[in-house]
């Protein structure tokens, strides 16, 4: 499973982090697949490559709590939510409308048949 998480690269008492996409089984400061951005907690500066972060989130990467908060502050999680989940609800309403139309079309009116009987 791929995770978006922080990798510490700062020196002692001067933390600095990289936001990376990495395998969940790798150590905190181990190898990573791709560099997404940086975070400096001392002055609160966040730099994120939105295209890469969005790509990884769409492919199913799970952000850690801290990374999710950083992405939310930058507005990326809201964009992802709107595209991923709102699109599903509009699809389901369109599908529901299409099935209702099919149901109306398949119902044929019953006609009475009369037979002429000669006496």
Swiss-Prot record:
| Keyword annotations from UniProtKB, A to Z | Ribonucleoprotein, Ribosomal protein
Q: Which Gene3D superfamilies match?
A: 3.30.1320.10
Cited PROSITE patterns: RIBOSOMAL_S16 (PS00732)
Q: Spans of biased composition, class Basic and acidic residues?
A: 89-103
Q: Which HAMAP family match?
A: Ribosomal_bS16 (MF_00385)
Gene Ontology terms: biological process:
translation
Which family does this protein fall into? Belongs to the bacterial ribosomal protein bS16 family.
Say if the entry is tagged with keyword Ribonucleoprotein: yes
UniProt keyword annotation of Cytoplasm present: no
What are the start and end residues of every segment in region (Disordered)?
89-119
List the protein's name. Answer: Small ribosomal subunit protein bS16
NCBIfam families xrefs: S16
Q: Which InterPro entries match?
A: Ribosomal_bS16, Ribosomal_bS16_CS, Ribosomal_bS16_dom_sf
This protein's encoding gene: rpsP
A single GO molecular function term of this UniProt record: structural constituent of ribosome
Q: Which GO terms describe its cellular component?
A: cytoplasm; small ribosomal subunit
> What taxonomic classification does the UniProt entry list for its organism?
Bacteria, Bacillati, Mycoplasmatota, Mollicutes, Entomoplasmatales
């Amino acid at each position: 499973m791929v995770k978006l998480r922080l990798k510490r690269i700062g020196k002692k008492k001067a933390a600095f982090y990289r936001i990376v996409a990495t395998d969940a089984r790798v150590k905190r400061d181990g190898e990573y697949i791709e560099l997404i951005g940086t975070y400096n907690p001392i002055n609160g500066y966040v730099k994120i490559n939105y295209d890469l972060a969005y790509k990884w989130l769409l492919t199913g990467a799970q952000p850690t709590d801290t990374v999710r908060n950083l992405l939310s502050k930058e507005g990326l999680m809201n964009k992802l939510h709107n595209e991923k989940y709102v699109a599903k609800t509009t699809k389901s309403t369109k599908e529901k409308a299409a099935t209702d139309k099919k149901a109306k079309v398949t119902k044929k009116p019953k006609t009475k048949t009369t037979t002429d009987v000669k006496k």
